[in-house]
């Protein structure tokens, strides 16, 4: 949620947020569960798509939009389901009119099986939206060159995946994700592929600025409890990063220093 005081706020496009967790709103078993999960997680933003099919009772009809307003959490519209630059740009423009916000999570799908982003067209779509005044948060792979190009065209934050959407596998390419953190100075948020709170904690320990979740919470046996677990994990990972973890060692080192000879070994004769 928006933050005005915290010294460790998440800052995106000049706006401060108290939470470093962003939460998706799809696939929850009911509107009441969705509402309770959002209230438990207290996310910075919740994502929503204009291209809803209405097959899920938690997502169908005007009640869903009423729920979003009632939650009083900033909405991050997305372009889910778009396969072309023009489709994504048009959807973003419609979302700006509906929600009255310049924020957009840019999704441009290149493969329907893996839901992998169309990296060839993603940069051009982002460039057009940035020029049109949008605060673009692009969903992308962990490819360093792609992410750098997105920054070059004006994206002030980038959202690489940990694994394909909905797989819950956690970070499948830790080396690439850590390289991104070392090379890019903009905020980085992991979007997609996290399945466990420990996954979220791990990427936060690597120095990521936040995470965006949906399926891992919505499809949990207890989505509300899982929302809270992820919120706690994100904060724990952030705190650990700031605290500065010890370096891994190859050899064992005693945690209690031993000085001199134990008293029971002294010669009392």
Curated annotation (Swiss-Prot):
The keyword Transcription regulation does not apply. It is found in: Cytoplasm. This is Thiazole synthase. Transmembrane segments: none annotated. Residues 245-269 are annotated as: Disordered. It comes from Paracidovorax citrulli (strain AAC00-1) (Acidovorax citrulli). GO terms for biological process: thiamine diphosphate biosynthetic process. The gene is thiG. Catalyzes the rearrangement of 1-deoxy-D-xylulose 5-phosphate (DXP) to produce the thiazole phosphate moiety of thiamine. Sulfur is provided by the thiocarboxylate moiety of the carrier protein ThiS. In vitro, sulfur can be provided by H(2)S. One of its GO terms (molecular function) is thiazole synthase activity. 1-deoxy-D-xylulose 5-phosphate binds at residues 166, 192-193, 214-215. The active site is at 105 (schiff-base intermediate with dxp).
